[in-house]
């Protein structure tokens, strides 16, 4: 085996799809997730497909210190050196901002931002000084660069994740550690509510499969770029939002009535 890869949110669509592209590259894989039964099911499916692969799992809530510790202990006990951490675990949040309960805003921020930050900090303290190359890749979103109505709380988490990734990568410049950021566009996963799926269809939003995202991730992993956004025209709008944000605001304003309609059904 090449090296060890840890995938948080490993029981979900994108996490398990990424595992399927890493295993043929020689990685031993550790999957982490909160749903123990679902995690066991994913591991069983992967082992049926990849008979000789090293695939293990840790059921853990990474928003809790005990969960982070359990995953880190498992990784530290492996004879295979850690070379890749993929912070993929996350939660969606759709709705008009004033309608979202404060507890829900706090819960999603903890899952999407605080948990990956604290787990990464623990990895760096305990395993990051071994001198071996280590990549930490944070899975973000197009909504980490473009503020989108109906997703204000979710955007806040992904903007935070992107900024932290950029700052931390610069903090480790000149070392063997890299922190990178990979941003899918809308993806068909169980994180989407029925209202989100219906709204995307009404707006003509292209949604990628988890497998397509994983293929793009594999390409990104083999390169050297700090960050990548996938999908067209999303990449164009990411650029446009940087140079002419008012143009993007005008375009999105036309979608607000539809967004409000589906937000009321969330």
Model-assigned labels for residue ranges:
Residues 96-97, 101-107:
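Substrate-binding pocket helix/loop in short-chain dehydrogenase/reductase
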Residues 141:
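Residue(s) in the substrate-gating loop at a strand-loop-helix junction
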Residues 120, 157:
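Active-site helix of classical SDR
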Residues 181, 201-238:
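C-terminal helical subdomain
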Residues 88-93:
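Conserved NAD(P)H cofactor-binding loop of Rossmann-fold oxidoreductase domains
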Residues 25-42:
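Conserved glycine-rich Rossmann-like NAD(P)H-binding loop of the short-chain dehydrogenase/reductase
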Residues 11-12:
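Conserved glycine-rich cofactor-binding loop
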């Amino acid at each position: 085996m090449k090296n060890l890869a840890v995938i948080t949110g490993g029981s979900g669509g994108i996490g398990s799809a990424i595992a399927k592209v890493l295993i043929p590259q020689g990685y031993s894989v550790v999957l982490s997730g909160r749903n123990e039964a679902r995690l066991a099911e994913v591991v069983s499916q992967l082992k049926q497909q990849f008979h000789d692969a090293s695939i293990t799992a840790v059921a853990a809530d990474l928003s809790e210190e005990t969960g982070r510790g359990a995953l880190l202990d498992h990784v530290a006990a492996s004879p295979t050196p850690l070379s890749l951490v993929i912070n993929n675990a996350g939660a969606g949040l759709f709705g008009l901002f004033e309608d979202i309960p404060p507890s829900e805003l706090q819960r999603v921020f903890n899952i999407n931002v605080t948990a990956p930050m604290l787990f990464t900090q623990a990895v760096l303290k305990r395993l990051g000084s071994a001198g071996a190359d280590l990549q930490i890749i944070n899975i973000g979103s197009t909504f980490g660069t473009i503020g989108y109505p109906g997703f204000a709380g979710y955007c806040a988490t992904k903007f935070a994740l992107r900024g932290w990734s950029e700052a931390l990568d610069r903090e480790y410049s000149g070392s063997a550690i890299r922190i990178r950021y990979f941003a899918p566009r809308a993806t068909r996963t169980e994180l989407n509510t029925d209202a989100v799926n219906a709204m995307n269809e009404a707006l003509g939003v292209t949604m990628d499969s988890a497998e397509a995202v994983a293929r793009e991730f594999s390409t990104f992993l083999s390169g050297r770029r700090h960050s990548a956004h996938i999908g067209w025209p999303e990449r164009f709008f990411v650029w446009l939002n940087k140079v002419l944000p008012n143009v993007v605001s005008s375009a999105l304003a036309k979608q607000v009535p539809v967004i409000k309609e589906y937000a009321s059904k969330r």
